[in-house]
A protein has these predicted regions:
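Short beta-strand His + acidic residue motifs that chelate non-heme Fe in jelly-roll/DSBH
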Residues: 80-81, 89
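Short cysteine clusters
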Residues: 49, 73-76
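N-terminal pre-ligand scaffold of iron-sulfur
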Residues: 1-66, 81-82, 96-113
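Short cysteine/histidine-rich metal-coordination sites, predominantly Zn2+-binding motifs
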Residues: 63-71, 87-95
């Protein structure tokens, strides 16, 4: 099945560094996603831990560790690299978050779902 480009949010809605969680609809299905902005780059992922399949955040829009160097799963503290979603610490080490290719047009972030 081919992917569908979906509008996520405006680029300026996310601090740098920072993150934002969203629920988006594509093909009549709701999907939890989140966007991370760091050093003016944006990365989008499905909001699902590879270990438990539950959401990574326990506080809305809080996906990064205290130093904003890693994406962190609030359930068990797993740490994921921001740029590629690779788990570098925790029970799902070496697994990856599902990355969603994203683009920015007219300061609006879109992702392929």
């Amino acid at each position: 099945m081919s992917s569908i480009e979906t509008r996520l949010c405006h680029y300026d809605e996310i601090p740098d560094p920072g993150s934002k969680g969203l629920v988006v609809e594509a093909r009549n299905t709701l999907t939890r996603v989140f966007v991370v902005k760091k050093d003016q780059q944006v990365y989008a992922y499905e909001n699902s831990c590879p270990h438990t399949r539950g959401p990574l955040d326990w506080v809305p829009d809080r996906f990064l560790d205290e130093d904003a160097n890693y994406i962190m799963c609030a359930n068990h503290g797993a740490l994921f690299q921001i740029g590629d979603g690779l788990c570098v610490y925790g029970p799902c080490k070496n697994d990856r978050l599902r990355a969603l290719p994203c683009t920015i047009r007219n300061r609006v972030i879109h992702a392929q779902l």
